[in-house]
Amino acid sequence: MQVIETLAEGLKREIKVVIPAKDMEDKMNERLADVKDKIRINGFRPGKVPAAHLKKVYGKSIMAELVNEIVREQPTAILSSRGEKSATQPEIAMTEDKDEADKILSAQQDFEFTLSYEVLPPIELKSVKGIKVTREVIDISDDEVTEQVLKVAESARSYESKTGKAANGDRVAMDYVGKVDGEAFEGGTDQGAELVIGSGRFIPGFEDQLVGVKAGEEKTITVTFPADYPAKNLAGKEATFDITVKDVAAPGAVEINDELASKLGIESADRLKEIVRGQIESQYGSLTRQKLKRQILDQLDEMYKFETPASLVDAEYNGIWSQVNNDLAQSGKTFEDEDTTEEKAREEYKTLAERRVRLGLVLSEIGEKAGVEVTEDEMQRAIYDQLRQYPGQEKQILEFFRSQPGAAASIRAPIFEEKVIDHLLTEIDVTDKKVTKEELLAEDEGEAKAETKKAAPKKKAAAKTEAAEAGEGEEAAAPKKKAAPKKKAADESAE
């Protein structure tokens, strides 16, 4: 077998592979010899079929098997022998001419194919001893825990029907039909909708006009949709809602006690507070971790400058760009609304994609050298978390992970990345700094603005290697404002 490099330009490589017809024929004859005793052909005793006849009957099919095996197995072996790692699966090209293909399968012509790929750049790891980061630490007060428990209690609050007029804080159950210019609009109708007056769930002015209504009353209220309302066909327009009040209910008292905990399936009020405190700690911990990680990535980005494989950058960029456009479509906005142009946005996201890929390669190299591995238990837990997000679709999701190799990689990559960050935190200089809740949140908002209003895409581009998937924990840029999340058709129209 001859392996000839025909292109070496930057990270791009092209390899021509030639396997002489004689070698292919020898391999075919070996296969025929192995199976001759098992083949049954009418008119011949087992094992007595002449080699020439076997070759005539089965030669081409065996040669086709050999060709498939070679193009499946040899690229990996060739790259390994060259000491190279491809950024993506190598592209394989071979003749498409029917006559030439027939000659190859008949061992009358050498078998040739071409590998085209990009190599992962060699990365010489640098010392991380000079990296210094600040880990913000926040003390959670009892008052904050109580405040959050009260919010939980509000959600579990009971209501009791009353005969009087609705007041602020009362819950109103109603049917309604929304109209613009006298015509009912899509999503503007609901039956049995419940709304707590003063909750701010519906658009401005809607809830205020429910104050004073009674059960059984019919009323038409008039509101104006905000100018920046996500649904462009409603934004800034006056609308009427014909309402039939079904019930008015007064709120019960909100108390933090064992009875409340019992309603929530928790053994006691103290245990409820423990759970809430744990949730707050987790939320602040995630924010602190995110900011800590950003500091590490920023400094690694300054330390490493090298050419990145275009194929990986394109895949990452396409994923970001797709999400950005989805966000714009959902919000009904344009790039001009975000004080930019499509051209400038493309440049920014291309730069972000390059940074992500570069840092992904660096993190992958650091992790490999440090012996970081993702265990089977960690993978199973991550997949289980995915299953919990889609109840009723467990079977389809499991089948997806089994049938799509890239799906497992997309689960493994973020776990691998976080474990590399954990490793780095043991190697770098970390200083703890106590901050208040306001400082923690205010700084994060400031950083978000400084980073051109970045927001994480919901899905990453499917990467072809773990190095690329290990990508980056930072967030991809997105529009400043998103459309309000859609709830029920009724809520959506009146929010």
From Swiss-Prot:
Residues 441-495 are annotated as: Disordered. Gene3D superfamilies: 3.10.50.40, Trigger factor ribosome-binding domain, Trigger factor, C-terminal domain. It is found in: Cytoplasm. Its EC number is 5.2.1.8. One of its GO terms (biological process) is cell division. Consists of 3 domains; the N-terminus binds the ribosome, the middle domain has PPIase activity, while the C-terminus has intrinsic chaperone activity on its own. Belongs to the FKBP-type PPIase family. Tig subfamily. This is Trigger factor. It comes from Rhizobium etli (strain CIAT 652).
